[in-house]
A protein has these predicted regions:
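C-terminal helicase lobe and adjacent C-terminal extensions/tails of nucleic-acid helicase motors
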Residues: 90-114
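Amphipathic, charge-rich alpha-helical segments that serve as recognition/docking helices
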Residues: 1-91
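Sequence-pattern detector for short linear motifs
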Residues: 25, 43, 51, 106-108, ...
Length: 167
C-alpha cells in the first residue's frame, strides 16, 4: 500500500513523508531499503522525514503551498519551540518581519545565525558530534562544502551538558 500511495502523481510532500515514516515504523524497512525501493537518495528520504516534525501551522502552509518544501525542511530541522517562534514572527498572517519571499539559503542562514550553536566555539571533546544527526555538518549533501564554521549543534541540551561536563 505504501508503494502504491507513493506512486500516485498527486502525492504531497507530507503524505510522502508520512508514508516513509510508516514504512520505517513497521519494522519492514530501513532508510537504506527505502532508498533501493523508491530510487531516492538517503538525503532526500531523510529530508522528507523531517517534514513529519513540522508544527501544524507550518505543515498547513506547506500543504497550501504557501511555503516551499525546501523552506519547510529547513525549519523542521529545529525543535518545536523554535519552529513556533519562527512561525509567529516570520510566517503567520500579519507578521511584521515576513520571510515568505526569502530564498531557502537565506532562510537557512537566518535560522542558523539566530538559533544554532556553532560547535567550533566550544572546547569539549566533539568525537560523538562527528556522527550525530544533530550536527548540521552531517546534514549536507556534499561534505566538502563544509568548511570551518558550518558545524552547528541543533540539540542545545546535549551540547550544554557536554560543555558543563567539560568545565
Amino acid at each position: 500500500a505504501i508503494t502504491e500511495n507513493l506512486q500516485r502523481e498527486d502525492v504531497t510532500p507530507r503524505e510522502e513523508a508520512a508514508a516513509y515514516k510508516r514504512a520505517l515504523e513497521s519494522g519492514r524497512h530501513t532508510i537504506e531499503s527505502l532508498v533501493g525501493k523508491f530510487g531516492k537518495s538517503e538525503t532526500y528520504i531523510r529530508s522528507r522525514l523531517k517534514l513529519c516534525d513540522l508544527i501544524d501551522a507550518l505543515a498547513e502552509q506547506l500543504d497550501r503551498e504557501e511555503i516551499s518544501v525546501g523552506v519547510a525542511t529547513e525549519i523542521a530541522k529545529y525543535n518545536v519551540e523554535v519552529q513556533q517562534e519562527v512561525y509567529e514572527e516570520h510566517f503567520s498572517d500579519g507578521c511584521r518581519l515576513s520571510w515568505k519571499n526569502a530564498r531557502i539559503k537565506e532562510i537557512a542562514r537566518r535560522l542558523y545565525d539566530r538559533y544554532m550553536t556553532r560547535l567550533d566555539t566550544y572546547r569539549f571533546d566533539k568525537t560523538e558530534c562527528h556522527t550525530c544527526h544533530h550536527n548540521t555538518a552531517n546534514q549536507i549533501l556534499f561534505k566538502d562544502e563544509c568548511t570551518d564554521g558550518c558545524a552547528g549543534c541543533q540539540n542545545r541540551n546535549c551540547m550544554m551538558r557536554k560543555n558543563d561536563e567539560y568545565l
